[in-house]
């Protein structure tokens, strides 16, 4: 009875949560009765803690509504339900014959393999050991991405296959790819994990065709345990590469081998890529990596300074983080310049010193992002009139873009709430605060608003 009610509870959660939240936290759970207790099994500690912290009240409320005082007790555990452990697993799809020990590749490509031991080393050589989960600075902007990546590292080929990470440049997607690779190799040193840029895949295929080595190319890519491809959007308009990757993708998934892809945009928005590929990109889990919010930018600067052996005052970190907002790479580059100048001049790192060291960068940023620029960009994006930003109209088609513009002004400029309100037709600062909170809430609940906000930040920060 309780287990069947759990299926109904899943339906309730699917209605109340976003598709991404449901896929990441609820779908992996398994349920089984143990006496008068319903045990929910999570695949790992991270999922267990998250569900218990975020969703336990919704689950308890549902069971109380349905069963009253007869509602079962709830307990969480890690692993799979005992009854499932006794079931013989279905045989994995046959893996393509690698032929590593018989065939020597004829070209100097990623698949130039002579023997199996060398193959293992070759597969792992491009996973950067410096990129770990421990040194990935987590914030609201990348929390789901990191959580999904950690689960893939623990259970490659499992629930999130493929995992598709998308967002602007310099936001940490590549860091997460390497962190997953390092996690997989730590758990299984013999795992064949390949990371590459999409252009490398194209180059390998072209060389294979030129050297009549296409079969070796296929064997190589279809025999790996995990394939991570960065910037998949560069497959656009490369028909033969897309054709080969389509078959590689299918072969890997049939064998339960992990695939992770990254792009600068949502899968369906990638122009020049076949629909059948874009559809497959969304088969697993798709997660947005957004520009870091202020607190995360500060944490990134403090972590980088600590790694460099530099004492960075809090007020300096906040000064830089409030002015440089586009991506992690820009933040780290700015800090490197500050550190180099400090080492060269012997001067202490103060706000005045940073203002001088980053003069050109700060001037460019302040010139690019203004409230007026934000209003024009948002109005154009939503196809409304610029005058609507200042008007008193309250229809959703106008009010929602106006709220988005206010939230962006709060995040991307140094203007105070009253100053932002003045720029939007003399509105009160409480109106701006309400808009910021409303958009923050909608970014959690609405995929469309989340996408719009991320797209606008990329446009304004480029």
From Swiss-Prot:
One of its GO terms (molecular function) is ATP binding. One of its GO terms (biological process) is regulation of DNA replication. It is found in: Cytoplasm. GO terms for cellular component: cytoplasm; plasma membrane. InterPro entries: AAA+_ATPase, Chromosome_initiator_DnaA, Chromosome_initiator_DnaA-like, Chromosome_initiator_DnaA_CS, DnaA_C, DnaA_dom, DnaA_N_dom, DnaA_N_sf. Residues 84-125 are annotated as: Domain II. Residues 1-84 are annotated as: Domain I, interacts with DnaA modulators. Pfam families: Bac_DnaA, Bac_DnaA_C, DnaA_N, Hda_lid. Gene3D superfamilies: 1.10.1750.10, 1.10.8.60, 3.30.300.180, P-loop containing nucleotide triphosphate hydrolases. Residues 126-342 are annotated as: Domain III, AAA+ region. Residues 343-462 are annotated as: Domain IV, binds dsDNA. It comes from the Bacteria. ATP binds at residues 170, 172-174. The keyword ATP-binding applies. The keyword Nucleotide-binding applies. PROSITE patterns: DNAA (PS01008). Keywords: ATP-binding, Cytoplasm, DNA replication, DNA-binding, Lipid-binding, Nucleotide-binding. HAMAP family: DnaA_bact. Belongs to the DnaA family. Plays an essential role in the initiation and regulation of chromosomal replication. ATP-DnaA binds to the origin of replication (oriC) to initiate formation of the DNA replication initiation complex once per cell cycle. Binds the DnaA box (a 9 base pair repeat at the origin) and separates the double-stranded (ds)DNA. Forms a right-handed helical filament on oriC DNA; dsDNA binds to the exterior of the filament while single-stranded (ss)DNA is stabiized in the filament's interior. Domain I is involved in oligomerization and binding regulators, domain II is flexibile and of varying length in different bacteria, domain III forms the AAA+ region, while domain IV binds dsDNA. Oligomerizes as a right-handed, spiral filament on DNA at oriC. This is Chromosomal replication initiator protein DnaA.
């Amino acid at each position: 009875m309780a287990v069947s009610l759990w299926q109904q509870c899943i339906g309730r959660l699917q209605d109340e949560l976003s598709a991404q939240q449901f896929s990441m936290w609820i779908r992996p759970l398994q349920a089984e009765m143990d006496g008068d207790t319903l045990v929910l099994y999570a695949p790992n500690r991270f999922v267990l803690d998250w569900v218990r912290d975020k969703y336990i009240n919704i689950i308890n409320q549902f069971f109380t509504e349905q069963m009253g005082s007869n509602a079962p007790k709830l307990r969480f555990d890690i692993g799979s339900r005992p009854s499932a452990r006794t079931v013989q697993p279905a045989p994995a799809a046959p893996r393509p014959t690698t032929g590593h020990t018989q065939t020597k590749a004829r070209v100097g490509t990623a698949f130039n393999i002579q023997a199996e031991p060398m193959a293992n080393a070759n597969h792992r050589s491009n996973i950067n050991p410096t990129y770990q989960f421990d040194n990935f600075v987590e914030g609201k902007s990348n929390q789901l991405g990191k959580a999904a990546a950690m689960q893939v590292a623990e259970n490659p080929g499992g629930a999130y296959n493929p995992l598709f990470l998308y967002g602007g440049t310099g936001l940490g997607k590549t860091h997460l790819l390497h962190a997953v690779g390092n996690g997989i190799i730590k758990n299984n040193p013999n795992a064949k994990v390949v990371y590459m840029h999409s252009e490398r895949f194209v180059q390998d295929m072209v060389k294979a065709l030129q050297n009549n080595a296409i079969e070796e190319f296929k064997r190589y890519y279809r025999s790996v345990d995990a394939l991570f491809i960065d910037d998949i959007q560069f497959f656009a308009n490369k028909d033969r590469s897309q054709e080969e990757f389509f078959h590689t993708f299918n072969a890997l998934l049939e064998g339960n081998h992990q695939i992770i892809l990254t792009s600068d945009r949502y899968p369906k928005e990638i122009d020049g890529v076949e629909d059948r590929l874009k559809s497959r990109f969304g088969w697993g889990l798709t997660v947005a990596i957004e520009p870091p919010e202020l607190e995360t930018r500060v944490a990134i600067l403090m972590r980088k300074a600590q790694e460099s052996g530099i004492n960075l005052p809090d007020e300096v970190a906040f000064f830089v983080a409030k002015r440089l907002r586009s991506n992690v790479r820009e933040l780290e580059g700015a800090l490197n310049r500050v550190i180099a100048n400090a080492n060269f001049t012997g001067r202490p790192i103060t706000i005045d010193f940073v203002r001088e060291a980053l003069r050109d960068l700060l001037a460019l940023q302040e010139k690019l992002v203004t409230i007026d620029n934000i209003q024009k960009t948002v109005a154009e994006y939503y196809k409304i009139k610029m005058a609507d930003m200042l008007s008193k109209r309250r229809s959703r088609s106008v009010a929602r873009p106006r709220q988005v513009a206010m939230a962006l002004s709060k995040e991307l400029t140094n203007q105070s709430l009253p100053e932002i309100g003045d720029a939007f037709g003399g509105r009160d600062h409480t109106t701006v605060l309400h808009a910021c909170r409303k958009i923050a809430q909608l970014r959690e609940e609405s995929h469309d608003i989340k996408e719009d906000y991320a797209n606008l930040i990329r446009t304004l920060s480029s």
